[in-house]
Regions:
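Bacterial N-terminal signal peptides that target proteins for export
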Residues: 1-8
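Extended active-site neighborhood of metal-dependent phosphoesterases/phosphodiesterases
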Residues: 69-156
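Intrinsically disordered, low-complexity segments enriched in Ser/Pro/Gly/Ala and basic residues
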Residues: 4, 13, 25-26
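N-terminal active-site segment of His-dependent metallophosphoesterases
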Residues: 17-75
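Bacterial N-terminal signal peptides
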Residues: 9-17
Length: 156
């Protein structure tokens, strides 16, 4: 993430964080990211999530290392759906945010995945989810990086 993207996120968070957050004390919010490489560590993380007390899990991006081109792409099964199956079977909500690696394919595939799996939530690349007075943002900053470099190249 570049400095400009970080400043935008911090600005948004500073506006949102003015009011103290009162969250449900019984809720446990869990976060994972860059989970697209199939290896023993990924399996341990998925198992831990499946056996956890998480109220929800938010995937912060890079769902697969190579991106996926379609709903039928073997990479989707091999790198995400099959390894995450033990967790998906728990019914704990999984909120997806796409990352730069997901743009190596077609990131809109995850919109279709969310329709096929009731526990996966991904209505768009930018969305919010509120739990009481606590609000989480899904901010796909990859598009801003691409626009930044596009315009930077055009001005040289």
């Amino acid at each position: 993430m570049n400095a400009k993207s970080l400043k935008i996120i911090l600005l948004i968070l500073s506006v949102v964080a003015i009011k103290p957050i009162i969250a449900d004390e019984s809720s446990i919010y869990c976060f994972v990211g860059d989970a697209g490489e199939v290896n023993p560590t990924q399996a341990k993380v998925v198992k831990a999530l499946a056996n956890s007390d998480c109220s929800m899990v938010w995937h912060l991006g890079d769902i697969t290392q190579l991106g996926v081109k379609s709903i039928d792409d073997p990479e989707l099964q091999d790198s995400f759906l099959t390894p995450f199956k033990p967790f998906l079977e728990t019914g704990i909500p999984l909120y997806l945010t796409v990352g730069n690696h997901d743009y190596k394919g077609d990131p809109s595939v995850y919109l279709k995945v969310a329709k096929d799996y009731p526990s996966i939530f991904h209505p768009s690349n930018f969305y919010t989810k509120t739990f009481g007075e606590l609000c989480f943002f899904a901010l796909d900053t990859t598009i801003f990086d691409k626009l930044y470099y596009f315009y930077k190249r055009g001005n040289q």
